[in-house]
């Protein structure tokens, strides 16, 4: 199926429209690439543990499993690790259908959730899942130098934390800048509101501390692409937080950070068009 995207439904904040033309070309190329790989075969693998079997936490052993969607008969393919949303309190691993049938692998991890764990356990689990992918994807035919990371909502927050605070992936022997690109969709850039909830702080009171992506802004050695829903339909200040992060990162000397505001889509609805754009970016 060919994706038809009307330019008026996508707002991209850039300093020139050359990049918007690139976006439209990427979507057109995606239509072609989907046709080329439509006949490829894929296999789905379920509930692979990405932590040690002798981990002392029974809940971690229970929760820290991932599913994989892998091209068969291909070598050197790209892989995206995709983190589900759910406010760090709910949700489950999902092999997003919008990312499928494009010649890439999808790794979809679960991670521990509040209230059975607390910050920073969520982010440490996310880092462990990405590190497992980097270290093991070659066993399935993938290229470990072509690993991407993305996620929606809480998954977007985790994506941002892994991109900006290098210590999480470093704990597992992976350089955050070795990831090819990060694609957070509607992620909070202040400290996540569930982490505020742990501390009995109001949902509406923004906190920027070491658990805020903003607080960890740095000069990046890889790509970061931001996606949000329509500023009038998104969760409170979600678009504005991401726009501010873009400004902070560029102020630190990063090459322009793209941000896509997807007009007409609310917080839940934005994940589908964002995933299609991500797939287009990965396969261009």
Regions picked out by a protein language model, each given a short descriptive name:
Residues 39-74:
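N-terminal cap/lid segment of alpha/beta-hydrolase-fold proteins
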Residues 76-85:
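Short beta-strand element of the alpha/beta-hydrolase
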Residues 92-109:
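Short amphipathic alpha-helix adjacent to the substrate-entry channel of hydrolases
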Residues 100, 199-209, 228-258:
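Active-site-adjacent alpha-helix of alpha/beta-hydrolase-fold enzymes
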Residues 117-138:
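Alpha/beta-hydrolase active-site loop
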Residues 134-197:
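Primarily recognizes the serine-hydrolase "nucleophile elbow" in alpha/beta-hydrolase
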Residues 184-216:
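Mobile cap/lid helix-loop segments that gate and shape the active-site cleft of serine hydrolases
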Residues 227, 243, 250-284:
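C-terminal catalytic histidine-bearing segment of alpha/beta-hydrolase fold enzymes
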């Amino acid at each position: 199926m060919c994706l038809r995207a009307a330019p008026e439904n996508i707002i991209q904040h850039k300093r020139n429209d050359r990049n918007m033309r690139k976006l439209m070309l990427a979507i057109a190329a995606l239509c072609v690439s989907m046709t080329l790989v439509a006949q490829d075969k894929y296999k789905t693998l379920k509930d692979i543990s990405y932590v040690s079997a002798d981990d002392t936490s029974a809940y971690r052993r229970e929760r820290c499993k991932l599913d994989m969607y892998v091209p068969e008969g291909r070598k050197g393919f790209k892989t995206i690790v995709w983190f589900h949303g759910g406010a760090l309190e709910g949700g489950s691993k999902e092999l997003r259908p919008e990312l499928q049938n494009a010649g890439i692998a999808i790794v979809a991890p679960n991670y521990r959730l509040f209230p059975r764990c607390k910050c920073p356990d969520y982010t440490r689990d996310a880092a462990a899942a990405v590190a497992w992918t980097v270290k093991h994807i070659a066993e399935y035919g993938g290229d470990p130098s072509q690993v991407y990371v993305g996620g929606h909502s809480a998954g977007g927050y985790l994506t941002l934390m892994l991109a900006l605070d290098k210590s999480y992936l470093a704990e597992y022997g992976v350089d955050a800048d070795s990831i090819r690109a990060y694609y957070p969709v509607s992620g909070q850039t202040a400290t996540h509101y569930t982490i505020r909830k742990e501390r009995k702080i109001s949902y509406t009171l923004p906190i920027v501390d070491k658990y805020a992506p903003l607080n960890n802004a740095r000069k990046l050695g890889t790509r970061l692409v931001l996606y949000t829903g329509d500023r009038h339909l998104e969760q409170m200040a979600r678009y504005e937080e991401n726009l501010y992060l873009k400004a902070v990162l560029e102020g630190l000397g990063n090459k322009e950070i793209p941000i896509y505001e997807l007009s007409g889509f609310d917080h839940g609805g934005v994940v589908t068009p964002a995933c299609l754009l991500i797939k287009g970016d990965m396969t261009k």
